[in-house]
Each structure stands twice: as C-alpha cells, then as structure tokens.
Amino acid sequence: MLKVTTAHIHFNRDNTPVSEQFDDIYFSTADGLEESRYVFQEGNNLWRRWLQFGENHFVIAETGFGTGLNFLAVTALFREFRTQYPDSPLKRLFFISFEKYPMSCADLRSAHQAYPQFNSLAEQLRQNWLQPIVGCYRFHFEETVLDLWFGDIADNLPQLGDYMVNKIDAWFLDGFAPSKNPEMWNENLYKQMFRYTKPAGTFATFTAASAVKKGLESAGFSLQKRKGFGKKRECLQGFKPLNAEQNPAVHTPWLLSRSATLSENTDIAIIGGGISSLFSAISLLQRGANVTLYCEDEQPALNASGNKQGAFYPQLSDDDIHNIRFYIHAFAYGQQQLRWAIQQGIEFEHEFCGVALCAYDEKSAVKLAKISDYDWDTSLYQPLNQQELSEKAGLPLPCGGGFIPQGAWLAPRQFVQNGFAFAQKCGLKLKTFEKITALSQSEKGWILHNDKNEQFHHETVIIANGHKLKQFTQTARIPVYSVRGQVSQIPTSSQLLKLKSVLCYDGYLTPADQAKQFHCIGASHVRDCEDRDFSLQEQQENQAKIQLNIAEDWTKEVNTADNLARTGIRCAVRDRIPLVGNVPDFERQADEYRNIFNLRRRKQFIPQAAVFENLYLVGALGSRGLTSAPLLGEILASMIYGEPIPLSEDILHCLNPNRSWMRKLLKGTPVK
C-alpha cells in the first residue's frame, strides 16, 4: 500500500485536537507549547548542547509529527540560537519525523490557529503538506531542514539504514500514549533508536510508563526520571553511554554511502554543465561550500539540458516499485524546488498544465492499466476514459489513459542558464571552455587535468558530465550508454493552440510556448550514438509517430517540414533509474568481493565497498532529468556532508553506482 492514510480527528471543548484512530489528545490540554518546550527541548538540554556543539549540523528525530508543534517550536528556538550566535560552527538543524496518519491541511490549519507566533512557519509547512505516497519528503525552512516520513514508523524507521548509524543527536520520543498506541512503543523501536543515536546522544519523552522505561534500558540507554509536565507525575529522559558499541553491525556494507572528508574551506569541483550540475551546485552552495564548475562548452546547457521545452513529470513504471517510488519522491521535491526558483527570481518559461498519458496501443493500454491498479491519490495520477482525457488535453484523442495533474513543461536551457547565473551570485565559480580530461588523487584531494596541460586542485569532485561520464579512468567501468535524441520544433496552428497539456504517446508534444509561436515534439531514441548532426529521417519520424499514435484530424497540422530541430545526447542505464553517490573502485571491489556470495552464506565479515575517497558522481538521468535532478543534487550534497539523506535506504541502494556489479557478485557471478 503506497497511499497515505490521513488522520480522523475532532477538536474537544478546549480546542485541542483528538485522534479518533487512537482516542487520544495530540498534546496537553493545559498548554501544548509549554509541554513541548519542557519535555523535549529541556529534556534534551538543546540550548546548552548547541552552545557547546562543534559540528556543522545537529540531528533531531521524532516518533510522531502530529500537528508539527514540536517542529515549529524547535525551529523557532534554533533561529533564535543562530541569531544570537551567528559565529557558532553549528549552522543547520535537521528534524526527522515520522507520521502514520497525517492530518488534512484544513485540520492542520485549525490546530495551528492556537499558535499565531508560528504563523509564517506553519503556513510554509502547509504549502507542502500532504504527499501522495508513503516515504520521506524533505522541506527547507532556511537553516532548518525537515525530513517528514509518512507511513508506519515500523516500516520507515529501518529505512534510515546503515548510513544513519550513530548520527542522531536527540530524540523526541512522542506519539500517542503507550496504552493507546502499543504497536509503536515496542522493543524494536528502542533498539533502532539506540542504533541510530550518537554516543552521548539523548532522548526525552512525556511518559514514564514502566514498559517504556524497561524497553529503553534494555536497548542500552541510561535513564533518569524527572517531574512531569502539568498534572503528569513523572517523565523520562536519558542518553546513550559513551562506552556503547561504536560500530554496530552494518547490514549491507557493499552499498553503504560514504561522506567526504571535508576541511573548513569545503572546496568542491563539479565537472559538467547541465541540470544535474546545477542542482548539485545549488544544494552545496546552500551549505556554504566553495563550489567551482568546469564546463567544456562556451556556456552551460548546450547538450541534453538545452532544449526549448521539456516535460516535467514522474516516470511511472508498471513493473518496478522502487523506480516508481523514486520518481514520485523526485517529482514532489522537484515541484518544491521549481517554486523556490520562481521565488528567487530565476526566470524561465513554464506552465503547470498537467501531462496526459495516452493508451495509444495495446501495450501502452496494458501498462497504464497496471499503473492505475496502484490506487493513486488523485493529486498524483488519474485514470481517465477517452472523453475525460480529451477534455484535459483540449483536443480530441482516440483513446483514454492517465493524467498527471501537477505535471508541467518548462524551458530547460533557459532554466539551467539562468539558474547558473543565480548560483554565481551566490558564490559559484563558473569556468567555461574548460575540458577536463583526467583526474588524479593527491594528498589533499583531487587534481583536475585539462586539455591545455593545466591542473586544478580541489578537495572533493563531482562528475556530472552526462553521456561523457565514462571518460575518466575512475568511471570507465560504470555501465551507462549514450542515447541520441532529436527534438523537432514546429510552428503552431489554430488547432494546435488548443492543446492544454503535455501529450505523451510514443513521443511527446508540448503546448505552445508562451509567445504562442511554436511547440516541441520528440524525441528520437538512437542508442549508442553520439552524432549530433540534424537527421531528416528522425525529423520525419517525430511527425509520423504522433499522426500514427493519435490518428485525429488535428494531428495533420503537425508539420516538421521547416527542419527546425535540436539534438542532444542523453546518458542512460539499463534499469532506467539514475546513478548517484560515491564513485566505486571497480578493480578493488571485483577483487575484495570475488567471494562475497560465500561470505554472506557463511555469515562472515564483509568489508565496506572500496570507493574513491571524496569522488562522487550523478548521472544516467535519461529523459527524466528535469524531474530527478533536484532530488539527486540534494541527496549528493547530504551524502558529502554526512547529513541525513532524504530517501529510503532501499531506494538509495537502487541508485548506487556499483549496483549492477553487486547484483552479479551477490549471486556468485564474477564481473570482468
């Protein structure tokens, strides 16, 4: 079940929200805000610890988001701390929270009315509130980052994964009373908490129930009781002892992501110039990194990111649940980042017009029927009949299909180039006509060698150069391939102007641009081809596809005869999901893991996968770069900084650059 189940609540005489699922109040009827401050902020000694904290970020995890009151209160407190102590090394707060039954937006607004001091934060929270499927969603509140996990904590907490072992500084052990919600308060929860908590990390909770106390002690926490809030006699707080096991077992060391070794200067180079480079740079700049981009062209966005119009929507697979989940989470984060870009004044043509998916033949009809079986929230996907889909498109269609109401088109080249101009104002150093031909390691990081025999030294390097990903010796064994795609630009007409949404069949057609002059139609798909010359055959095929798949009179006005087109080379991978993370050392992994099949079978020690330290990549975005790049850039920046990653571990494993080798090695098949 992917769909999020919302909470059923009512407000009692004190105007306190009450859960009908658990028959319990969300917070104290006396004063919910003061309870939050007393139990969780004071119970974890947050202010004192922040004053003494020597790291860049602090991580809080919470077991029940509810109305978000704890989050709003601690975000306000952290803003006060940053205002009073701007020179503190502590710059960012991460708040991870789990919620099985999120409130409706209307109920959330009603609950927030009691706390007008948080109006601005609460409004920002509600703007991005309900999401279509379970899993992790990241939201930015300036120096505070919220990772909100919708769904059962029993399923989601383990998905923090090996990467988050010993990374959480404080726990807000909240949620409905143990007597009302015994499924959450259990031994599994306490063991997971202990595994993720840093040595000397703390927890605080409103309850002092005997079963909770015993469970936390059994997991390894040191406990103490203190006076409870209001009428409660006692509550609990505690910590993970410093002498606790420092290196708990890693379940999948061959897929474990590694953070970078960073100096105070945090000097990072990006090799590329497309949309994945842009969002990697933005996420790093927001963390205060010194970022230099090396682009081999005269300006960014001259290859796969350079089209005049492109579609923004998730790739919905009918046979790969991890693929579906990744793209839906990427789509949600991408929407948030597009709104952010607009707020920042980054200009680009766009239209949130929706995307119509046509069941144009038997195969596509079967695929869309399978996709419809997932029982999506209608905000994400709507199965429609012929008449309904035609109404969404604004033109008659010969078939039904599906509709993605929050889909859009935007101008990729304009967006990427103006995005980089904005990034330069934020400190990005942009070097054009810099063709990096080789990478070599040094004592302090990496040396970039260009085609003019010059060298550039950087601490950390990200390879984001699209279809040229394999050009370096370190990435030569990554199993990606090139795909040539030609997009045709066609003049509009009286009929084509009626098109209201992006239309997808065995190709796609965009609505008219904002000047109402042209549409984009495409794209050809020629594997293992890097020739960018104009192809008359592909131009004619782009026209023929729509006239064959959508056999309506209006498609006769689609005319590619002007031979206006643009060709780009995409980077793709067989399993249709991008690559992001550490660059794996193929030679060492092939050697060290040659017997991993037997090591697992015998339950023997398996070392972490060999990678090139401080070298990362993002690639194989295929035809969905507009959708996936924002989340991939944020994942990469989080990984480099050792921060929480906004994605379930099982999906993150599917993005790992060494995944294809490991599938073979884990089966006992050698790789060559």
UniProtKB/Swiss-Prot annotation:
| Documented EC number(s) | 2.1.1.61, 1.5.-.-
What GO biological process, any one, is recorded here?
tRNA wobble uridine modification
Identify the stretch(es) annotated as tRNA (mnm(5)s(2)U34)-methyltransferase. Answer: 1-241
Q: Which reaction does it catalyse?
A: 5-aminomethyl-2-thiouridine(34) in tRNA + S-adenosyl-L-methionine = 5-methylaminomethyl-2-thiouridine(34) in tRNA + S-adenosyl-L-homocysteine + H(+)
This protein's cofactor list reads: FAD
Keywords attached to this Swiss-Prot or TrEMBL record, sorted alphabetically, are: Cytoplasm, FAD, Flavoprotein, Methyltransferase, Multifunctional enzyme, Oxidoreductase, S-adenosyl-L-methionine, Transferase, tRNA processing
Compartments reported by the entry: Cytoplasm
A cellular component term (GO) from this record?
cytoplasm
* Region called FAD-dependent cmnm(5)s(2)U34 oxidoreductase, residue ranges: 271-672
Q: Which InterPro entries match?
A: FAD-dep_OxRdtase, FAD/NAD-bd_sf, MnmC-like_methylTransf, SAM-dependent_MTases_sf, tRNA_MAMT_biosynth_bifunc_MnmC, tRNA_MNMC2, tRNA_S-uridine_synth_MnmC_C
Q: Which GO terms describe its molecular function?
A: flavin adenine dinucleotide binding; oxidoreductase activity, acting on the CH-NH group of donors; tRNA (5-methylaminomethyl-2-thiouridylate)(34)-methyltransferase activity
Main function: Catalyzes the last two steps in the biosynthesis of 5-methylaminomethyl-2-thiouridine (mnm(5)s(2)U) at the wobble position (U34) in tRNA. Catalyzes the FAD-dependent demodification of cmnm(5)s(2)U34 to nm(5)s(2)U34, followed by the transfer of a methyl group from S-adenosyl-L-methionine to nm(5)s(2)U34, to form mnm(5)s(2)U34.
Under HAMAP family, the record lists: MnmC
Similarity remark:
In the N-terminal section; belongs to the methyltransferase superfamily. tRNA (mnm(5)s(2)U34)-methyltransferase family. In the C-terminal section; belongs to the DAO family.
What name appears for this protein in its UniProt entry?
A: tRNA 5-methylaminomethyl-2-thiouridine biosynthesis bifunctional protein MnmC
